[in-house]
Amino acid sequence: MGKLYVFDHPLIQHKITYIRDKNTGTKDFRELVDEVASLMAFEITRDLPLKDIEIETPVSKATTKVIAGKKLGLIPILRAGLGMVDGILKLIPAAKVGHVGLYRDPKTLQPVEYYVKLPTDVEERDFIVLDPMLATGGSAAEAINSLKKRGAKQIKLMCIVAAPEGVKVVQEEHPDVDIYVAALDEKLNDHGYVVPGLGDAGDRLFGTK
């Protein structure tokens, strides 16, 4: 079973308070999501392998460490996942960015893939799937399916807010995928919204309704 990591860092929790607040406007909401994604990236990349290299400082030669050539891919789920990309790229500018687009079938209510564009070397790359909200878990699970069908083997899921129901779905369908969240909320309501949640992340990021 994949592990669930919930980040309790004070800076993250402080910023999530204002992400949740309905009075936070589009500009501030967008900046806060960017900042939280960047802070979460510190933890989600903690297991990146390192290697020793020789350098010369202004004082002497030294043996120090760099990331050992790991290929990373960020996969935002359209459209809300886009709001998390830049915050991570600030720390990992060499990461490649793909996209997965899904819509919900009005009859079956199941997510349907309509767009997938991935970086090269899929089988050799570590992927981080990005979505601010993990509600029912259907979209995240299907996005992970899309990656696996194309050869991806190392996948993590990163969300800002998650419902227990969504976590359970992803863990059951993808027991090999670890989930990283900034907040684990109480539940889903009868309409499938996370409670207390933060509303519709896509609408709040892009100023739409």
From Swiss-Prot:
Recorded GO CC terms: cytoplasm
Pfam (any one): UPRTase
Binding positions for uracil per the UniProt entry: V194, G199, D200, A201
EC numbers, comma separated: 2.4.2.9
Cofactor: Mg(2+)
Top-level class of the enzyme under EC nomenclature: transferase
Pathway entry: Pyrimidine metabolism; UMP biosynthesis via salvage pathway; UMP from uracil: step 1/1
Superkingdom: Bacteria
Reaction it catalyzes: UMP + diphosphate = 5-phospho-alpha-D-ribose 1-diphosphate + uracil
Record's keyword annotation contains S-adenosyl-L-methionine: no
Record entry for activity regulation: Allosterically activated by GTP.
Residues binding 5-phospho-alpha-D-ribose 1-diphosphate, per UniProt: R79, R104, D131, P132, M133, L134, A135, T136, G137, G138, S139, D200
Gene Ontology BP term (one): UMP salvage
GO molecular function terms noted in the UniProt entry: GTP binding; magnesium ion binding; uracil phosphoribosyltransferase activity
Annotated family: Belongs to the UPRTase family.
Annotated function: Catalyzes the conversion of uracil and 5-phospho-alpha-D-ribose 1-diphosphate (PRPP) to UMP and diphosphate.
Protein name per the record: Uracil phosphoribosyltransferase
Lineage start: Bacteria, Bacillati, Bacillota, Bacilli, Bacillales
